Amino acid sequence: IAEQNMFGMAAGLALSGLTPFVSTMAAFTTMRAAEQVRTDICYQNLDVKIIATHGGVSFGQAGTTHHCTEDIAIQRSLANMTLIVPADGWETANAVRAAVRWPGPVYIRLGRGFEPTHYESDDYGFEIGKAVTISEGTDITIIACGIAVYHAAEAAKLLRDQDGVSVRVLDVHTIKP
């Protein structure tokens, strides 16, 4: 396990003009290699794209050493870091394509890969920094990101069908900027 070295090498590749994509578990990206991500990549605003898997408690039975509930807060605090939390595989594909074109470091937080699919394709107007309106409503608004988007949409359907509540659901996939 050498996540620190991986991020140091990614910084070197970015300094040579390449756009490296690196991937490891969120706990190791955010905790084990925090200094390298912050100092080597973010401070220099390098074009490194980080794919962090197993965010939150998605690793289930692996326990607290592999859970990472603080990664969004930590990555959001880093200078120059763009932070995206896709809802599903379709949105992940859009996030990766957008990250390629986006200058500077990007952190894309994923679950374990068993998340339910919300979107039916990748053709819905994904744009870094702009929320996606899942449903329009006038009574309440639910704001969600990541796996919570699916659950927010399901809750909105229940509220509409059972109680007649008009619910707007927003997929705020970009946490920063």
PLM-predicted stretches and their roles:
Residues 1, 170-177:
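Short beta->alpha junction loops
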Residues 2-5, 12-141, 150, 167:
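Conserved thiamine diphosphate
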Residues 11, 39, 157, 161:
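Short, well-ordered alpha-helices that flank and scaffold nucleotide-derived cofactor binding pockets
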Residues 151-170:
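Short helix-loop-beta junction
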